[in-house]
């Protein structure tokens, strides 16, 4: 059996290949000892690691794994997934939305890291808890899916009420900027969480398309574990990317790009 592991700050992503079949699974990083014990009880032909906690695993297992830089591993894995999913693009920006978000430019041969922001899944969970007292990520994102941002976020259409705006009316003028205009309203947890995810999605997209413009590409690829069970984040990112005139790509199993790429480096 061949195993690639991306041991991140929040999740451990695992790719297994055996008998020409591929399997994906995740474990919380807090359960890293469980992963170590599992590896020590497996017959492993190839083991390759990446991510911030790769060294922790390598130090406690009986095997001799190879360790790779996570940016290179993610880029390689993304190349494989893009090809398998029929996306033929030569150069692009990709945003890896994990606990935080890193941005990379791929020129058809090599990747280079071109930026990063602290908005990502960590912000969704942390700010989401402060707004709702919910700690479970799946419960939080499920609730947010039912939220309405209009009572909380100030949109361009709210400012230009009776006239045609010079830019699309659905653009956000100020995140959370409509709250003081609706103090007589009851702000539900669903609405607050939807707006929090909106902030994350719009910041990530704004950064990604700015870099795409700088590197003269229309293609922006989004991967990362923050999209897991988070259709709202995906919609915000894809819609805003299109609205700004760029082409978004959401990659199935993109969160496993690092683990898959490590396996093939």
UniProtKB/Swiss-Prot annotation:
Top-level taxon in the UniProt lineage: Bacteria
Location of the active site: 70
Catalytic activity: (R)-pantothenate + ATP = (R)-4'-phosphopantothenate + ADP + H(+)
Binding site for ATP: 6-13, 99, 121-125, 137, 225
Location within or outside the cell: Cytoplasm
Enzyme Commission code: 2.7.1.33
One biological process term in Gene Ontology: coenzyme A biosynthetic process
UniProt GO molecular function: ATP binding; pantothenate kinase activity
Predominant subcellular localization, coarse grouping: cytoplasm
Coiled-coil segments: none
GO cellular component terms given for this protein: cytosol
Enzyme class: transferase
Similarity comment: Belongs to the type II pantothenate kinase family.
Function: Catalyzes the phosphorylation of pantothenate (Pan), the first step in CoA biosynthesis.
Official protein name in the record: Type II pantothenate kinase
């Amino acid at each position: 059996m061949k195993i690639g592991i991306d041991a991140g700050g929040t999740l451990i992503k695992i790719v297994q290949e055996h008998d020409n079949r591929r399997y994906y699974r995740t474990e919380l990083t807090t359960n890293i000892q469980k992963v170590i014990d599992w590896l020590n009880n497996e017959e492993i032909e190839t083991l390759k690691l990446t991510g911030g906690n790769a060294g922790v695993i390598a130090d406690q297992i009986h095997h001799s794994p190879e360790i790779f830089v996570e940016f290179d591993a993610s880029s390689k894995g993304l190349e494989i997934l893009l090809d398998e999913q029929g996306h033929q693009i030569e150069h692009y920006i990709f945003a890896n939305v994990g606990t935080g978000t890193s941005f990379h430019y791929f020129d058809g041969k090599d990747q280079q890291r071109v930026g990063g922001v602290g908005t990502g899944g960590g912000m969704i969970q942390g700010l989401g808890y402060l707004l709702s007292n919910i700690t479970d990520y799946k419960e939080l994102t499920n609730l947010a899916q039912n939220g309405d941002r209009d009572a909380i976020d100030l949109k361009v259409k709210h400012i230009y009420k009776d006239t045609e705006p010079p830019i699309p009316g659905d653009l956000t003028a100020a995140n959370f900027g409509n709250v003081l205009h609706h103090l007589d309203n009851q702000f539900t947890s669903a609405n607050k969480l939807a707006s929090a995810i909106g902030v994350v999605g719009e910041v990530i997209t704004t950064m990604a398309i700015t870099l795409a413009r700088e590197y003269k590409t229309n293609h922006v690829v989004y991967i990362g574990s923050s999209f897991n069970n988070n259709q709202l984040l995906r919609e915000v990112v894809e819609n805003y990317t299109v609205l700004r005139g760029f082409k978004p790509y959401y990659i199935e199993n993109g969160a496993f790009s690092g683990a898959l790429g490590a396996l093939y480096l």
